[in-house]
Amino acid sequence: MQTQDIITSTQNPKIKALLQLQQKSSLRRKEQLFLVEGRRELMHCLSRGYVMDTVFICPEILKAEAEYDTLLQALPKCHTIQVSSSVYDRIAYRGGTEGVVATIRMKEHGLDTLPRMPEGKAPLYVVLESVEKPGNLGAILRSADAAGVDAVIVCDPLTDLYNPNLIRSSLGGIFSVPTIACTSQECIAYFKAQGIRILTAQLQDSSLYYDTDMTLPTAIVMGTEATGLTNQWREAADAHIRIPMLGILDSLNVSVSAAILLYEAVRQRNED
């Protein structure tokens, strides 16, 4: 990595462009770039074949940890810019990210990028229809990674898959779990063609989730907390499932519900 003058002003054109990229999803789509902060998230990026475009580092903050060796080796392959701590505080979406922010090239996320399953393996997918809160999607990706889910499929999304808050809340799960974006119609057609059992989470006309077989090829489908699932998913479902609500409130946060349902699938699939 070659030494260079350190950017000390947030009015620098490169810093302004970075902040615009952070704030505007339309610009991210146009440039096909997104932002990642921190060693852990960047290492996840690199390990999954993402390509760094530009790296902004703060020498005052950058920590000399052994885990940085792989990251530092990658820096000469892309444009590297040094910034002061005051500038870094402005461009960092969250604190404690160890002095590294990078712009990353986007990947394709269509259904045709779904990984092929080994013969005899029953895939487990989680599907989210019209998810709009990036924090919820990030939390679900984190749970999906922990539960060994084969893919998270976002149908008719209302949030950007590369929203900085999504990346932050997923703790890198957006990179470790195959994530697909498509329409509900495309997804339903794919599941029907592949023999994937569709389980929709809803309160009405449903069975308790732990009484439902999740050992077969399965997609657990969830809607928004406000409106639930659309009719096309209800009509396409092979079964409707619910989590018992024993208090006054009639629903859980969608990320909490997803974690409960996914770990029931894990439990069933790991029974002796």
Language model: regions and residue ranges:
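Structured adenosyl-cofactor binding patch, chiefly the S-adenosyl-L-methionine
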Residues: 146-147, 161, 166-173, 231-272
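Amphipathic alpha-helical repeat scaffolds
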Residues: 38, 132-139, 253-257
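Glycine- and other small-residue-rich loops at beta-strand/loop junctions that grip anionic moieties
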Residues: 7, 34, 129-130, 155-156, ...
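A glycine-rich helix N-cap at a beta->alpha junction
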Residues: 71-93
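Active-site/ligand-binding-proximal alpha/beta "capping" segment
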Residues: 200-249, 253
